[in-house]
Amino acid sequence: MSSFPTVLVIGAGLAGSEAAWQIAQAGVPVRLIEMRPIKHSPAHYSSECAELVCSNSFGALSSDRAAGLLKEELRRLGSIVIRTADSHAVPAGGALAVNRASFSASLTKELSAHPHITIERQEQEHLPDEGQITVLATGPLTSELLAENLRTFTGRSECHFFDAASPIIEGESIDLTLAFRASRYDKGDADYMNCPMDKGQYLAFREALLNAEQAELKEFDKESAKFFEGCLPIEELARRGEDTMRYGPLKPIGLWDPRWGDLNDRDVRRSKRAYAVVQLRKEDLEGRLWNLVGFQTNLKWSEQKRVLKMIPGLHQAEFVRFGVMHRNTFSKPRSYLNQPCSSANDPTSSLLDRSPAQRDIPLQ
């Protein structure tokens, strides 16, 4: 029997799973509350802990980049999330990407086996009574009842934005006579699938995106729809200007198909280089599944099939998951949190962020 009071961690996403593990590793008992599969969010597909809803990439690996340095620090601090990600990594050039299914399944198994962690599958509808040491890590997809309770607790109105996920297709349906494998600037192995476009193909694709039907938002969301600027739907990028996509996720720089000729020949390079390139990243080691990088979208599923098949090499694409958009709830912590992230109303309650700096954050 532990002499420490039990800590309540609400939410078994990335932040909640890490918090529960670190607390338990210190010998403190933890109740980890997760509402799935009793109640699912609009974007989750499984009941596993730390399910990756959007990208399967954790960003740069190299420690000369800020994201890579942060991961190395977490590694040295014994992070279960980073350790599990390393164990389930898939080739992704200079990035740490994972097989999202085996990653979350493995992490769930470790959490379930920890002697100091009890996982309870139920919806937490309100904050616990004052005095209960609590970590709130429910993330941007916090259930409505708990979000309403938090608004009452903080005295702050709800803030929200819209986020989206990218489609995933079967690798065997990619036409390799048009697509090619390469990593940008030839860094590391040829881990990405690349679908090059000439100017005419790019402009036609953009026009199709602009005219495609989108999934309907609820009436109360239409007037206040805001997007997360770090993860904009591809159709929103298309709306922002003719060249926005090709200076963003479709940028062609650093990508060359050897079939085009000698990259060092200036005339060949000028005549053959792509106007834009769509990249796909592996979802598993075998390359059975690939996700379209930067292609989070709110298009209707039928429109996704029609428009995305215009991409050279994807004309026979078989979709295993379509892109979806969902409403994210976030908090403005500066107005009601002390350092480090404890509530001014109840110092025994804390909110966790996935990011290294405290700012306007999802409830995670």
From Swiss-Prot:
UniProt keyword terms in alphabetical order: Cytoplasm, FAD, Flavoprotein, Methyltransferase, NAD, NADP, Transferase, tRNA processing
Location in the cell: Cytoplasm
Keyword Ribonucleoprotein in annotation: no
Keyword Transferase: yes
Source organism superkingdom: Bacteria
Enzyme class: transferase
Residues reported in the UniProt entry to bind FAD: 11-16
GO biological process: tRNA methylation; tRNA wobble uridine modification
Bias-annotated ranges (Polar residues): 335-352
GO molecular function, one term: flavin adenine dinucleotide binding
Catalytic activity: uridine(54) in tRNA + (6R)-5,10-methylene-5,6,7,8-tetrahydrofolate + NADH + H(+) = 5-methyluridine(54) in tRNA + (6S)-5,6,7,8-tetrahydrofolate + NAD(+); uridine(54) in tRNA + (6R)-5,10-methylene-5,6,7,8-tetrahydrofolate + NADPH + H(+) = 5-methyluridine(54) in tRNA + (6S)-5,6,7,8-tetrahydrofolate + NADP(+)
Gene Ontology terms: cellular component: cytosol
Function: Catalyzes the folate-dependent formation of 5-methyl-uridine at position 54 (M-5-U54) in all tRNAs.
Family note: Belongs to the MnmG family. TrmFO subfamily.
Name this protein carries in UniProt: Methylenetetrahydrofolate--tRNA-(uracil-5-)-methyltransferase TrmFO
Source species: Prochlorococcus marinus (strain MIT 9313)
